[in-house]
Curated annotation (Swiss-Prot):
Pfam families: Ets, Ets1_N_flank, SAM_PNT
Keyword Transcription regulation: yes
UniProt lineage: Eukaryota, Metazoa, Chordata, Craniata, Vertebrata
Name of the encoding gene: ETS1
GO terms, molecular function: DNA-binding transcription factor activity, RNA polymerase II-specific; sequence-specific DNA binding
Listed PROSITE patterns: ETS_DOMAIN_1, ETS_DOMAIN_2, ETS_DOMAIN_3, PNT
GO CC terms in record: cytoplasm; nucleus
Keywords for the protein's UniProt record, in alphabetical order: Cytoplasm, DNA-binding, Nucleus, Proto-oncogene, Transcription, Transcription regulation
Subunit relationships: Binds DNA as a homodimer; homodimerization is required for transcription activation.
Gene3D superfamilies the record matches: Transcription Factor, Ets-1, Winged helix-like DNA-binding domain superfamily/Winged helix DNA-binding domain
Function: Transcription factor. Directly controls the expression of cytokine and chemokine genes in a wide variety of different cellular contexts.
Protein name: Transforming protein p68/c-ets-1
Amino acid sequence: MMSYYMDTTIGSTGPYPLARPGVMQGASSCCEDPWMPCRLQSACCPPRSCCPPWDEAAIQEVPTGLEHYSTDMECADVPLLTPSSKEMMSQALKATFSGFAKEQQRLGIPKDPQQWTETHVRDWVMWAVNEFSLKGVDFQKFCMNGAALCALGKECFLELAPDFVGDILWEHLEILQKEEAKPYPANGVNAAYPESRYTSDYFISYGIEHAQCVPPSEFSEPSFITESYQTLHPISSEELLSLKYENDYPSVILRDPVQTDSLQTDYFTIKQEVVTPDNMCMGRASRGKLGGQDSFESIESYDSCDRLTQSWSSQSSFQSLQRVPSYDSFDSEDYPAALPNHKPKGTFKDYVRDRADMNKDKPVIPAAALAGYTGSGPIQLWQFLLELLTDKSCQSFISWTGDGWEFKLSDPDEVARRWGKRKNKPKMNYEKLSRGLRYYYDKNIIHKTAGKRYVYRFVCDLQSLLGYTPEELHAMLDVKPDADE
């Protein structure tokens, strides 16, 4: 119900929302009150506050129209990042973060998110809603300027953002800030690309005969790569050597030998090696932090990822170590190695088969190890399910049915609880988890088995990715066919 009264400051009438009954001054917990009114030109919360405080004078502010949006945070068809075929992925990757650059140019949004007004923040959220087909987003939760938005911190931001897409939006915000903050390389290539940012986030394709890297324009046309990637532009090996790269997530950095002291990363420390046109050696990674969390989120599931990560980093390609995997990155032919004309042999099974640090009491397919192998960065839901399904201690609440890649959630609430614990989302439940599973339906990753409750089946080509047949896994886990089914 809206209340109508005269605003004496502007001399016109209009619908203004009344204060929400029962809201107390100074909410006890940040990011929990979505009923905060918007201000068009000034920040409604201090820079270090999660959400703007409620005050009586706020009802006198000019309405923005955002109060008419639903406050339902229901999320549907959120584009999670999953393995799939090249054909499906080439279509899905057309909707990229690079599309926001065009919006920035069209709407005059500053490149630095710190300079955004409330209107700019609203435009960014609207772009995300359209880009990822989000539904029921509560715009009032984002009534703040850019400085306040950036000051929220990841955990507080995730409380505001819709389920399953918060990590993506936060990374986009971080990328925008880092691109604005990065200095241009002090070399001759800078003149050729005066408006470029040289980060290996964009360096996703590598070959000795056709070496490519990405000096993306601020407003380049969208390409076929998702997330922060831009259109590839071929350059010569001489130009490649003069570029400086700073990788924000994976364990690979190409550095300008003259300016190594100026490069820093929050996630990995790198041992620099010589880069030549004929042999592009990769750095050796040590365990780091990603956004304040364990880099592979593997404390619970796998204790030996330090050694595995270090081993894989010397064999995986730039593409396979990207934080956000492309759909075609799960094909073995897309894993060029660091050495010229050499590709990693075998599958995930081959990487871990003979490793002494593989504990028999641990899952056959640790999610953290699989994430490191595929280069997906944060553990994805499908990887987490595979970890549980290959852990004998979890068979009481999730297990294979014995029919190929079909599995059953015997206790879906426990599966959701563990997923929430792994992703630091204590409010996770099966309803939210099932929305993630439903996204996999359209992408032909996982299908729901008709007529069977809580029974699903992997329909993608897991055997090629993992190197295991379902029968092999069943034998290793002592799985017996489910007679009841």
